[in-house]
Structure formats: C-alpha cells, structure tokens
Amino acid sequence: MVDPKESIDIENVVASTGIGQELDLESVAMDLEGADYDPEQFPGLVYRTQDPKSAALIFRSGKIVCTGAKSTDDVHQSLRIVFDKLRDLNIQVDDDPEIVVQNIVSSADLGSSLNLNAIAIGLGLENIEYEPEQFPGLVYRLDEPDVVALLFGSGKLVVTGGKRKEDAEEAVDTIVERLSDLGLLD
C-alpha cells in the first residue's frame, strides 16, 4: 500500500497580518490596479496576486487576510507583493509585518474505500459527526493534532484547521493507525 502521507496536497493556506494603521479603501481601490472594492457586497478590498496565485482581503482597519495560496511560502511571497504595492502608494508598512497562519486545508487519499458507518461506530460518537442525509462525509475531530478531518467513502479525506504542514501528516498517521487498529482499512 502506498503511504497515504505521500498523497497529501495543500489546497489552501489562510494567513493574517496587518499594517498597523487604518486605510481609506476607496482611495486605495482607485490607485491600486486590479483591486476589487464593492463595500455593498464585501467590506474589504480584494487584491489578487497571480504568481503565486492568492487573494488578499484588505480591510479598513489595516488587517489583511491572505487566502488561496498553496503553501506557507506562497502566502509570504503574496503578502510581500501586497506590502510592496501598498508602499508604492506611499502607505507606511513595516519592514517585516508579522504573518500568522490561521488555517491550512489539505487533501489526501487513504488508498481504499471506507465504510463510514463502521468508522462512526468504531471511533466513538464523541469525536464524530456523521449524518449522510446532510453531508456525505464523516466529520472526525482530532485532539492531537487539533484538526478536523472529513473522511469520504472513496477513501479521500480533507484535513482542516492545521497551522503547520506537519499537522496534516500527523492527522493522516493517526487516522490510518486508528482505522487499522479497528480493522477498517484494507
């Protein structure tokens, strides 16, 4: 069997930062080429970077959320681009604002189909939500690492809530170990 950890792909990294001052988003939107700002639809200004591909949500408070990046390196690179664009508009930005990863969403494949009913019973209901009429996946809340895994009958899974790439690897290891111990993984 292929090691399921080898199948892990980061799908999205969400991080936050700030420039420590309020912004006039209407003014920034007029001067920042490619910016989208429609305060009736969303309170922040959206600025997309192409390489690496991500979206920065810039708020009046000076807080910035970066989403859509495929790695923590891409988050840092995208936000450096945003900081430089703001500096080009004569907006004061610290040399190295703190960037905090809030969430990493990863996908993986356990390599065999899963009996979600048996897993729900085997893992115990205190950490599990499984209502197939509502959602086809089984929601498994892990304590260590502190993440949520969505398991699907196909054997595919999504891990969300991680702060580091290793959180997904540890979660997959834990899931494989627990399902194997229960005899529920081929």
From Swiss-Prot:
GO terms for biological process: DNA-templated transcription initiation. Keywords: DNA-binding, Repeat, Transcription, Transcription regulation. Sequence repeats lie at residues 10-86, 101-179. One of its GO terms (molecular function) is DNA binding. InterPro entries: TBP, TBP_archaea, TBP_dom_sf. Belongs to the TBP family. General factor that plays a role in the activation of archaeal genes transcribed by RNA polymerase. Binds specifically to the TATA box promoter element which lies close to the position of transcription initiation. PANTHER family: TATA-BOX BINDING PROTEIN (PTHR10126). This is TATA-box-binding protein. It comes from Haloarcula marismortui (strain ATCC 43049 / DSM 3752 / JCM 8966 / VKM B-1809) (Halobacterium marismortui). The lineage of its organism: Archaea, Methanobacteriati, Methanobacteriota, Stenosarchaea group, Halobacteria. The gene is tbp.
